[in-house]
Amino acid sequence: MTISTTSTPHDAVFKSFLRHPDTARDFIDIHLPAPLRKLCDLTTLKLEPNSFIDEDLRQYYSDLLWSVKTQEGVGYIYVVIEHQSKPEELMAFRMMRYSIAAMQNHLDAGYKELPLVLPMLFYHGCRSPYPYSLCWLDEFAEPAIARKIYSSAFPLVDITVVPDDEIMQHRKMALLELIQKHIRQRDLLGLVDQIVSLLVTGNTNDRQLKALFNYVLQTGDAQRFRAFIGEIAERAPQEKEKLMTIADRLREEGAMQGKHEEALRIAQEMLDRGLDRELVMMVTRLSPDDLIAQSH
């Protein structure tokens, strides 16, 4: 349970009451809807830290969070209580944000399942009754579509079960999907014909090709990579010059990266021995930023 800390006398008096366990217990017992109340073992009401709240939400919430165990004792329930003396149109979304933050904090504590978080709003403003829906889905421009999206499983693109023939029809996504589906295979030479067919379509630009082949190189070994890209170049002569240029550039970048990493290693050894930083930079030709990054 959390209580607002905005600086009004309404908030202050509400907080002064609801910070006490017995008062909080009575509030939940009286006002939580009966079906939800039956889930809670209010004898286990416990004050929890809520330092996990992000800066945007800190202006609305105090450092009080109450949890209760379920009647079956197999899980936790959090009750979020918010006080308002003025109605807020997007209040349900704000409470949802806090609820999700509480769920994440619960997982960060080592639990493996999401807890139930029950938001409640205590209102005593001038406008009566409360004028806005407290279902956050009603706050979308298209509530009906929002209900379809957030009340069912999210779309999944599991490329591992998509047939290669179908992937080949996926236009500008096809080459990426094909490579990522099969990237864990020891030998990618079996994909050469399909890759050549996709290169001919011109759906992949040079930057994407370089990124893709660099990905293949990073996840395999150099010897197999050379055979792989060489075979593609032979099967796609119109792309051969471009592919070999990319391969050469990747090899050069790999060599440069290796030299840079070796320089960083030497610099660290020199610094560990107490040598002057200026001398280290002169010997290794590293920049001050390189040394700062290395120290972290």
Swiss-Prot record:
GO MF entries: double-stranded DNA endonuclease activity
Summary of the knockout phenotype: A quadruple rpnA-rpnB-rpnC-rpnD deletion shows no change in basal RecA-independent recombination.
Biological process annotations from GO: DNA recombination
Domain of life of the organism encoding this protein: Bacteria
Keywords, alphabetical: DNA recombination, Endonuclease, Hydrolase, Magnesium, Nuclease
Enzyme category, top tier: hydrolase
EC number(s) per entry: 3.1.21.-
Position of the signal peptide: none
Family statement drawn from the similarity comment of this UniProt entry: Belongs to the Rpn/YhgA-like nuclease family.
Function statement: A low activity DNA endonuclease yielding 3'-hydroxyl ends. Upon expression enhances RecA-independent DNA recombination 19-fold, concomitantly reducing viability by 98% and inducing DNA damage as measured by induction of the SOS repair response.
Protein name as annotated: Recombination-promoting nuclease RpnB
Encoding gene, per UniProt annotation: rpnB
